[in-house]
Structures are given as structure tokens and as C-alpha cells.
């Protein structure tokens, strides 16, 4: 297994090069959307990641699969970058490259990632309200929401921005009340 520090040393140059390419071509937002799509595909189909990480499988087979899966879904320049990762035997880091690219893109564009957990799915109006409040709170120029559901919250919302957690859930309120009564 490769340490996270070593992975960063391997991944950072590729993520930074993709940021530079996207910025230079005016495609940064397109690349970011494509990277989110790639990351989601990797999350939804772990077999794809296993196939790409398998050192026994030839690079040509991996590039053919990348072509089949992503050709009509992502920008051709980004697809070429995935093939380059394959040729350089770095394709096993694709998920990490996606995460690092998105981190750099958010930092470059002053966008914060807000991980929002609720008991039930949020409406578009609720999502917009959360975005506005997070923007006011962080002074960011934009907010990217990652919404998940956890029925154990009972109600309310938990918002995580970086290392900061804002717990406005019923479960959190009950826990704080229990601590006060104890």
C-alpha cells in the first residue's frame, strides 16, 4: 500500500497540470464537472477502479475501456490526460487525481465544499438557502454542496465546511440537552 504522502507526490503534478490546462483553455468549469462525473463513476463501479489498478492488464486494454466508458461523456483533452495517466502507469491514482483537482479548482475559484447531511432530501429552495448562508459565513464566492441523507438525524441539518461542523439536527439538540441535564 502506498502512503498518502507518496500518493500526493505522485498525484499533485497531474492535478496541477490539469488545472493549468483547463485554465489556459478556458475549460476549468468543464474539467471540474467532468472530474466530478469520473469520481462518481469510480464510486458507483468499484470494478472499474480495480480493473484500472490491475498491473497485469495491459495499458492498451485500459485505454480502450476508458475510451468506451468516457468518450462521449468527458472533454477529449481530459480523456487524453486519462490515457497519459495509463501510459505512465498512474491510472490507479485516478480517484485521487480527481479529488485533488477538485480541491485545487475550488481553492482557485474561492469555492467552499459544504457537506450537508439531512434526514430527508433537500428541495432546491433549501439547497439555495444553505448555499447563501454558507457563502455569508465563509465569504466564499461560491458553494459546492454534497448532500447526503441520514434518517438517524430525526430532522434538521448538519453542515461540514472543512474541519468546521455546524450541527443543527434534532439528534444534536437532544444530545446537547442530555449533556446539560446530566
UniProtKB/Swiss-Prot annotation:
Gene Ontology CC entries for this record: plasma membrane-derived thylakoid membrane; proton-transporting ATP synthase complex
Membrane topology recorded in Swiss-Prot or TrEMBL: Peripheral membrane protein
One GO MF term attached to the UniProt entry: proton-transporting ATP synthase activity, rotational mechanism
Alphabetized InterPro entries for the sequence: ATP_synth_OSCP/delta_N_sf, ATPase_OSCP/dsu
Top-level taxon in the UniProt lineage: Bacteria
Keywords: ATP synthesis, CF(1), Hydrogen ion transport, Ion transport, Membrane, Thylakoid, Transport
The keyword Ion transport appears for this protein: yes
Cell compartment(s), UniProt: Cellular thylakoid membrane
Major location category of this protein: membrane
Function: F(1)F(0) ATP synthase produces ATP from ADP in the presence of a proton or sodium gradient. F-type ATPases consist of two structural domains, F(1) containing the extramembraneous catalytic core and F(0) containing the membrane proton channel, linked together by a central stalk and a peripheral stalk. During catalysis, ATP synthesis in the catalytic domain of F(1) is coupled via a rotary mechanism of the central stalk subunits to proton translocation. This protein is part of the stalk that links CF(0) to CF(1). It either transmits conformational changes from CF(0) to CF(1) or is implicated in proton conduction.
Family of the protein in this entry: Belongs to the ATPase delta chain family.
Quaternary structure, from the entry: F-type ATPases have 2 components, F(1) - the catalytic core - and F(0) - the membrane proton channel. F(1) has five subunits: alpha(3), beta(3), gamma(1), delta(1), epsilon(1). CF(0) has four main subunits: a(1), b(1), b'(1) and c(10-14). The alpha and beta chains form an alternating ring which encloses part of the gamma chain. F(1) is attached to F(0) by a central stalk formed by the gamma and epsilon chains, while a peripheral stalk is formed by the delta, b and b' chains.
Protein name per the record: ATP synthase subunit delta
The species this protein was found in: Synechococcus sp. (strain JA-2-3B'a(2-13))
Lineage of producing organism: Bacteria, Bacillati, Cyanobacteriota, Cyanophyceae, Synechococcales
